[in-house]
Amino acid sequence: MEFDDHYRQAQRATYDCLLFDLDDTLYPLSSGIATECRKNIGDYMHEKLGIEESKIPELCDILYKNYGTTMAGLRAIGYNFDYDDYHSFVHGRLPYNKLKPDPVLRQLLLSLPIRKVVFTNGDEVHAAKVLKKLGLEDCFEGVICFETLNPPSSSCGTQTSSKIFDIVDHFSEPDTNGIELPKTPVLCKPSVEAMEHALRLANIDPQRTVFFDDSARNIRSGKRIGLHTVLVGTSHRVKGADHALESIHNIREALPELWEKAEKSGSIRHSGKVAMETSVTA
């Protein structure tokens, strides 16, 4: 009996969930969506928050580096705004027509009888539009998005100080050691707290999950919480990445064991399409 139990445990798949970032992961950076998004963020900061245009590039870089997203950083340093208005302005004007259906990726995803979940810092509407444009809207069990981690009742109405913290000036000082940066009410990657919370909400076991993301910071955080990590968009493997793929189409090349187990069980779905061969570092 004990032998049978051990045998059954050995037959269990190594992974039972695939967790995917959305932007610049399920579609390539070359689409230009990220560039347009950065422009819209800058326009929002100038038009809606009254920030001088000349100060926006440096401010964006500092906020992104220290808070994960510019939005999270803006809230931290004292700007109060409606999250829906921000997302509508930043994402609502994106050229989604640049995204095209990806039948190769669709077949790769559908060929595996395993949980597949999207985890994005973006809002729900944006995620739905992207997945629909890619033809992947029915390939995932669910989407963990901005609203999942930041429900309106928890932080949208949180008031911040009327005084704006000058974070640019803070980092221009020769010695900022010991001076703590203001905290943000926004939960988002690469915060370990946010990522752990997301996994709890989705009932995902990090030890049995493969995490795909184009951000090296997110990959490092994913590794810290026990995820098996795959950096997407480059073949250069960075610290914290178990694998590195130039293209998401190379999932099978990086993790052949997923398909091998499915093929042995007879549950894999075959297609006449062949995935592109690009570089992978493991």
Residue ranges and their predicted role:
Residues 1-15, 110, 123-282:
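Asp-based, Mg2+/Mn2+-dependent phosphohydrolase catalytic module
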Residues 2-20, 25-106, 123-128:
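N-terminal helical cap/lid subdomain that shapes the substrate entry/recognition surface
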Residues 25, 120, 214:
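Conserved G/P- and acidic residue-centered "switch" motifs that form tight phosphate/ATP-binding loops
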Residues 32, 96-100, 118, 182-190:
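Short, surface-exposed alpha-helical recognition segments that flank or form part
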Residues 79, 114, 227:
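Short phosphate-binding/catalytic loops that engage adenosine nucleotides
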Residues 103, 108-117:
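Internal catalytic-core helix/loop-beta-alpha segment
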